[in-house]
């Protein structure tokens, strides 16, 4: 029976493979793919391939196999003009961002637009109503919808309507290049975790030994639970384009701990992108790192295979780590390295002697019997900025110490930061040694407080510009009183030990104390809210005018969240701030579902022409769909990430310009086939194509509005008769500013 089953499975697999290989390419162009399956996009995975059309529209798109047209859809956003084809093998194929369809389908669209009095069309067909043979022309490539340039977006979906990877389902590319590795991140997954002497996530470069093999830069010293995340790309022979990898597997001591395969997924799990590609590292501009672990089954995407979770809680000692990263053509790259599991260690350093151009420093183990065999040293200036890595002129062992000779030109008037490495591979916490450097005055230097929210813990930071030799500690006043000694992890930067988010419950404030010959106390107002389990919660700004509301669905796990006032916000080119700017925190926390921010207006103030905006690094101040409650004068908006927000007044109407036809112009009937122009709003923006109206002699036109190019386009159905015409364009931005342009023209 087993043999029969194996033979049958082999036959079916071969049959599916041969069937898949029989598909044809959807464009009559060379195979150039600019973006592949599961590439990270804002809060979603890329569901298919972006196929290059050489920067032009109008290339013929053909059916990859026989079947029927299941659906056509037309809109001004998203995928624009889309055709869904049901193949005879049961799969669905999507051709998107099209410029147009067949003549028959274009006629059906025009009929539906007139019938529904809307540009938007969503038309379904019965099975076999619109038959299509392999290679049949089905439309033209374009840049419709939210496309950033001409290309064909191409998807394949299985019988459950799940996107599947075209590269592994009949559209593989000739590829002899192995995936390229970049960096490895080690993520703390418990409040007790320490990584190379540090409690925050650590990112390590990977050393290339060959095209097929990369290595850790050194043994990584870990204490307690961690997860690994990988920054890697794939390259395809003949193209200088970075692609998403097809999969990766993590092994510890030759046992598989985690497997990731970008084969298929459900649209309902798109939000898990931010738990699959590390959201914190991405928001901190470190790039895209594929997590090789899951926090819980709730955060497990369809790409995670098997029952292993990848959270590494390893026994003390050395553990070999191996990663196998592969592409769709089964080109494989390996990464290998070692994790050393042991409690964190400390060192101390002292200057033994000086010469004309060098100083001699001894680095001792502090509280450990294991000798120091190596070290890393960085020089910081008196303001606490790192300037240079200091390499030794010489080094030698002396009992358990390491004695090193360092150049004076790199160390004089600087703070030296030492991390010792002992004979077992343990990496110490940082130790600071000033060498003829100015020490900051702890009584007058201003300090700032910030908080980092990790996966399972919270780290409080107090920082200033300078180096301090005094001891420092925090007192947290909340549901319980906590006294926390601080460590100076860099000159002028003090960190608490990691706390559980629950330790911040009912927090009223934080007192920072620096103890020297004189004692200085600073009080910081800090009032986070705690989201736990099935409860909704709300955090308020210190001034009480901004509130951040969460539901039981907002977070994946217990989270402390709070609001900070922004002292020096990014300025406005147009418009006026009508509130303070508030930073919602933790800004790098992945959200499962939406939260709601509300900002209170003055009682005497109208909300006309106002809205809540957030700051986007690429787009600048960006409008959020806002609603006013007249009862409490709160302007509110939903959001899916924590941003800097403010109420902004925008009184500038949209601009309507560069229109064809021109004012008082005359055209021949056969040359007049399209009406086009620009409609643009600099601040609040145009929300939807329905916020623009266009009439020709009083009759509504059902036009396309391209949200990226800010372009209106209407294709005439036939030719205009001779005579004079009036075109009227009206545009309203998202806070109600309106513009109207009237164009009179004639046709011969």
Annotate the PLM regions.
Residues 133, 174, 189-192, 200-344, ...:
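Long, low-complexity serine/threonine/glycine- and acidic-rich segments characteristic of extracellular
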Residues 164-221, 338-360, 434-453, 648-668:
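Short, compositionally biased P/S/T/A/G/V-rich stretches that sit at domain boundaries
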Residues 206-250, 354-362, 451-461, 589-597, ...:
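Contiguous beta-strand segments within globular domains
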Residues 220-222, 238-244, 366-373, 410, ...:
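A short beta-turn/strand-edge loop motif at beta-sheet boundaries
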Residues 412, 634-653:
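C-terminal beta-strand-rich structural cap/linker in extracellular carbohydrate-active enzymes
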Residues 471-476, 550, 587-643, 689-693, ...:
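Proteolytic-maturation and junctional protease-sensitive modules
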Residues 529-538, 565-616:
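Proteolytic processing hotspots in large secreted/extracellular or virion-associated proteins
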């Amino acid at each position: 029976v087993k043999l029969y089953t194996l033979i049958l499975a082999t036959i079916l697999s071969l049959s599916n493979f041969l069937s898949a290989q029989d598909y044809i390419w959807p464009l009559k162009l060379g195979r150039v793919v600019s973006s592949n399956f599961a590439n990270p996009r804002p809060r979603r995975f890329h569901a298919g391939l972006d196929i290059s059309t050489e920067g032009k529209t109008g290339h013929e798109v053909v059916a990859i196999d026989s079947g029927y047209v299941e659906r056509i859809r037309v809109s001004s956003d998203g995928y624009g003009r889309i055709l869904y084809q049901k193949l005879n093998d049961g799969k669905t194929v999507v051709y998107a961002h099209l410029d147009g369809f067949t003549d028959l389908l274009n006629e059906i669209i025009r009929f539906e637009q007139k019938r529904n009095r809307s540009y938007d069309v969503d038309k379904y067909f019965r099975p076999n109503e619109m038959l299509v043979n392999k290679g049949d022309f089905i439309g033209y490539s374009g840049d419709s919808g939210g496309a950033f340039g001409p290309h064909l977006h191409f998807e394949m979906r299985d019988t459950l309507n799940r996107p599947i990877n075209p590269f592994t389902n009949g559209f593989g590319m000739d590829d002899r290049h192995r995936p390229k590795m970049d960096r490895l991140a080690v993520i703390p997954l418990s409040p007790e975790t320490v990584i190379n002497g540090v409690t925050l996530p650590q990112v390590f470069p990977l050393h290339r030994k060959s095209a097929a093999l990369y290595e850790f830069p050194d043994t990584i010293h870990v204490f307690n639970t961690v997860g690994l995340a990988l920054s890697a790309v794939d390259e395809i022979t003949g193209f200088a384009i970075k692609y998403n990898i097809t999969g990766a597997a993590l092994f510890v001591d030759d046992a598989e701990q985690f497997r990731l395969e970008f084969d298929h997924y459900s649209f309902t799990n798109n939000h898990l992108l931010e738990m699959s590609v590390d959201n914190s590292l991405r928001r901190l501009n470190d790039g895209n790192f594929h997590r090789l672990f899951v926090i819980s089954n709730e955060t497990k995407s369809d790409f995670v295979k098997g029952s292993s979770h990848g959270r590494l809680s390893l026994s003390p000692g050395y553990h070999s780590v191996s990663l196998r990263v592969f592409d769709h053509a089964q080109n494989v790259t390996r990464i290998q390295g070692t994790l050393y599991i042991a409690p964190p260690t400390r060192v101390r350093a002292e200057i033994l002697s000086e010469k004309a151009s060098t100083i001699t420093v001894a680095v001792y183990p502090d509280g450990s019997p294991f000798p120091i065999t190596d070290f890393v040293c960085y020089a910081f200036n008196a303001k606490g900025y790192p300037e240079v890595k200091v390499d030794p002129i010489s080094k030698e062992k002396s009992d358990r110490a390491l004695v090193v000779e360092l150049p004076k030109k790199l160390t004089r008037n600087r703070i030296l930061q030492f991390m010792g490495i002992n004979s077992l591979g343990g990496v110490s916490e940082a130790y600071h040694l000033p060498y003829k450097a100015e020490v900051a005055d702890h009584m007058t230097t201003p300090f700032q407080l910030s908080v980092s929210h990790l996966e399972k813990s919270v780290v409080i930071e107090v920082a200033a510009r300078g180096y301090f030799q005094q001891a420092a500690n925090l007192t947290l006043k909340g549901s319980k009183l906590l006294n926390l000694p601080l460590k100076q992890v860099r000159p002028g930067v003090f960190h608490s030990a990691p706390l559980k988010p629950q330790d911040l419950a009912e927090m009223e404030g934080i007192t920072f104390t620096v103890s020297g010959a004189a004692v200085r106390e600073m009080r910081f107002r800090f009032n986070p809210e705690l989201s736990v389990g099935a409860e909704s919660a709300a955090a308020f700004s210190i001034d009480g005018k901004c509130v951040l509301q969460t539901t039981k669905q907002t977070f994946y796990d217990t989270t402390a969240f709070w609001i900070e006032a922004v002292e020096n916000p990014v300025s406005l080119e147009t418009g006026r701030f009508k509130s303070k700017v508030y930073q919602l925190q933790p800004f790098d926390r992945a959200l499962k579902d939406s939260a709601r921010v509300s900002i209170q207006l003055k009682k005497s103030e109208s909300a006309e022409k106002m809205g809540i905006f957030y700051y986007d690094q690429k787009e600048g101040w960006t409008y959020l769909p806002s609603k006013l409650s007249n009862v409490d004068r709160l302007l509110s908006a939903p959001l899916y990430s924590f941003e800097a927000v403010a109420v902004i007044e925008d009184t500038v109407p949209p601009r309507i310009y560069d229109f064809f036809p021109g004012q008082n112009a005359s055209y021949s009937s056969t040359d007049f086939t399209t009406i086009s122009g620009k409609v643009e709003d600099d601040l609040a923006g145009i929300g939807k194509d329905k916020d623009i109206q266009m009439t020709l002699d009083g009759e509504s036109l059902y036009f396309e509005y391209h949200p990226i190019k800010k372009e209106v386009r209407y294709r005439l159905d036939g030719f205009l008769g001779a005579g004079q015409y009036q075109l009227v364009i009206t545009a309203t931005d998202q806070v109600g500013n309106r513009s109207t342009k009237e164009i009179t023209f004639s046709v011969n």
